């Protein structure tokens, strides 16, 4: 099993990426696991020093994809970048998966152009995994497709359900449609038509879900267009960040607050760890014909390590094959 890792992508690259790779090899029970590091060979070797393992190999790259690069153009403009080379390794069957904490838009575009789509997939979806009051959930789409049709949202639901089944072993995840009200008549024409389609096609569809219930809804999979999903995701990030800072500032005001905070610190740490993106790692682009995992730009070594484990699990459990079968089950609607 070979996993290609973009050593140069992310805010903490290459240090966090390389340490994450080493930690993954140290902790993995899979003796067949090999990690291909893509990036500047000199920089990689300087960091690795004596930590060179027979399970690590390096592919030298002279180009680097930045956050300002246009994803659809990097294949021609930066063919020797770690991102393009890594995705190409998956295409050529020289790697089983690719991981990057770099430019998400560029990775999505390059993955789609190089790997193509799974047969009958109309639009690949960008999903995000998060914890809630009742376990892990998937929100899809979170930015790849601002404009969609009902059949695209159906495919997002199918692919996300299969992916969550792989990560959380939930056999029949419940699907909810993000909307401004729970009634079927709520929302734009797109969402009304999507509600009808999901109701007829999915036995696990539980109806509309308002954004205030994202974290406590019975739905395990939440579906929406990319504009709505991206807004929800970034608003939630901002709320958590601001709320955490407000608590910290308030605690520092009085001694008794500090004492109280110390007493509940273990509980707060457990909650923080539950919502920590590092625990899950990254998320694969759903619908792309190959495993291409996107990580948070601020990924630490722990996040990279867990992304390697996620890739390993996706490979072992034939995620791409299962998504293909799931899509075929609804092919009549897509025609």
Residue ranges and their predicted role:
Residues 52-95:
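Phosphate/nucleotide-donor binding subsite
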Residues 1-43:
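N-terminal phosphate-binding or glycine-rich loops at protein starts, especially the Walker A/P-loop
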Residues 20, 24-26, 110-127, 193-198, ...:
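A glycine- and small-aliphatic-rich helix-loop capping segment at beta-alpha/alpha-beta transitions
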Residues 13-18, 80-93, 97-111, 122-127, ...:
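Short glycine/serine/threonine-rich phosphate/pyrophosphate-binding segments
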Residues 89-108, 186, 191-193, 197, ...:
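Glycine-rich phosphate-binding loop
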Residues 112-123, 131-139, 221-222, 226-335:
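Glycine-rich phosphate/nucleotide-binding loop
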Residues 13-16, 28-36, 146-211, 220, ...:
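Glycine-rich phosphate/diphosphate-binding loop of Rossmann-like nucleotide-binding domains
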């Amino acid at each position: 099993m070979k996993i290609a890792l973009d050593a140069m992508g992310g805010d903490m690259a290459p240090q966090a990426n390389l340490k994450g790779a080493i930690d993954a090899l140290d902790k993995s029970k899979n003796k067949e696991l090999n990690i291909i590091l893509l990036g500047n060979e000199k920089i990689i070797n300087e960091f690795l020093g004596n930590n060179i393992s027979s399970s690590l190999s390096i592919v030298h790259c002279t180009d680097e994809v930045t956050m300002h690069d246009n994803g659809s153009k990097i294949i021609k403009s930066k063919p020797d970048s770690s991102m393009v080379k890594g995705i190409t390794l998956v295409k050529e069957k020289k790697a089983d998966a690719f991981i990057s904490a770099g430019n998400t838009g560029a990775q999505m575009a390059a993955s789609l152009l190089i790997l193509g789509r799974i047969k009958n997939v109309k639009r690949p979806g960008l999903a995000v995994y998060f914890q809630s009051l009742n376990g892990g959930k998937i929100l899809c789409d979170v930015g790849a497709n601002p404009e969609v049709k009902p059949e695209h949202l159906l495919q997002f639901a199918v692919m996300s359900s299969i992916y969550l089944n792989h990560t959380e072993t939930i056999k029949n995840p419940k699907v909810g449609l993000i909307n401004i009200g729970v009634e079927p008549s709520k929302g734009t024409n797109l969402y009304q038509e999507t509600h009808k389609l999901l109701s007829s096609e999915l036995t696990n569809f539980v109806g509309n879900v308002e954004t205030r219930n994202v974290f406590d809804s019975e739905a395990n999979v939440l579906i929406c267009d990319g504009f709505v999903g991206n807004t929800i995701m970034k608003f939630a990030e901002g709320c958590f960040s601001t709320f955490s800072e407000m608590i910290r500032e308030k605690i520092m005001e009085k001694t008794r607050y500090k004492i109280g905070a110390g007493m509940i610190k273990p509980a707060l740490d457990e909650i923080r760890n539950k919502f920590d993106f590092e625990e899950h790692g990254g998320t694969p682009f759903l619908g792309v014909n190959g495993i291409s995992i996107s990580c948070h730009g601020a990924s630490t070594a722990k996040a990279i390590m867990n992304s390697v484990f996620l890739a390993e699990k996706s490979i072992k459990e034939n995620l791409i094959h299962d998504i293909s079968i799931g899509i075929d089950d609804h092919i009549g609607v897509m025609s």
